Amino acid sequence: MLQFGSVDIHLGAQSGKYPDGNQVVVRGSDVCVAFDTPLASRSRTDLLSQVDLVILGHVHEDHVTALDLMPHAAVMAHALDVAAVQSWEGLCTHYGYAKP
């Protein structure tokens, strides 16, 4: 892990290359924010339990893999990605896959 003041960077395998990613968490005075939830974050459930807000860069599997570990956290995503984050059907529609 790298620390820069209140910013923690948890390095995934292969320096964060796909599919592991790197987990960035910013600890503020009132809120703890995670940027994306890559595979690397699945090994840091202790940290994820502290997260209040998740900001998703976009809805690819390597950015949302550990989102299920933070049901307590609010999630922010681009307006065009919201349906894909909310349900499996929304994700299928987002990527043009046949509905389940």
Language-model regions, residue ranges each:
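Conserved beta-strand hairpin/beta-sheet module of binuclear metal-dependent hydrolase folds
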Residues: 1-46
